[in-house]
Amino acid sequence: MDLPFETGEGEGEGRGTLASKVLLVDDEPVVLDICVRLLAREADLIVSPVGSAEEALVLLKDQRFDVLVTDKNLPGMGGVELIAEARRMQPALEAVMITAYASSESVIAAFAAGASDYIVKPFDDLRVLRAKVRAALERRSERVRTRDGAREMARQAAALLDAGRDAPEPAHEALETELRNYEQAVRMGHTGSVAVVGSAEAVKVLRDAAFEVVELPPYSPQLESADVVVVETGDPQWHTLAERLQGRSPDVVLLAGADADLSDLLEAITLRMDLVGYGQSNAARILPEKVRMLLMRRGIQRAQQRLTAALDTFRQSIATTN
């Protein structure tokens, strides 16, 4: 059973090596050499260095990579365009942008293209690059584990139903119901509660996309019970709100317009917040897609918990019958 948000995920797992593959793109030979040397120290990383986006695309056509690390300013196709094309070719790819000329616009553009992290050169500590690559690999591994867990859970339920034909009818019906609910959540699990702080425009965009949305003030205790909280960088209390919600129930999405403060965006990246560039022509698509993805992940997790409980109950009913 393929999860709709993990198309192509993990297809290279059987390639005969436990190493992760990193595609490194920079047109400065010295920088490229330093980065390659740093990452090559990791025994479980295979690094492929190239000097242009065009060279990177050739490799992406023939090989599956786990992480793309690219400079923003490249000859020919730029880093932002490369990330967008690479993610189109390999949707499971994690992408990290590197630049010596950071700006709010470049951060927003990188994340809109599909980047999940951002590094400003020169590195204060060369280990930053290694840490960012490791974090990207962990994010990808978590998605693979979620996908594999979903498949295994559905397989177990189907096998148990077949093996436990003599189980009491109520137990059979309960497990079949939860299995159907689980499969439904995998296919269409993008329902849940969404709260927006400080952006009437975001409320409208999400409602137009058929989400149930409530607009709340930043101090509202209801925020902690929401599934997804959308907050705008223009809200003066966004730092406090983000820190309060970190580690709590909601997923936090930060809206950032072209006039967003660069330090705010870099702090949001440090806090591992989901960042959405707003005020762009494609904003009406990007925000609903991000919220839909987060709600789908949550819906699957909840359905998996219910199915686990139903499996345990069914096993107990079989044991009692025998």
Could you say what each language-model-derived stretch is?
Residues 128-140, 146, 286-298:
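Receiver (REC) domain switch/output surface
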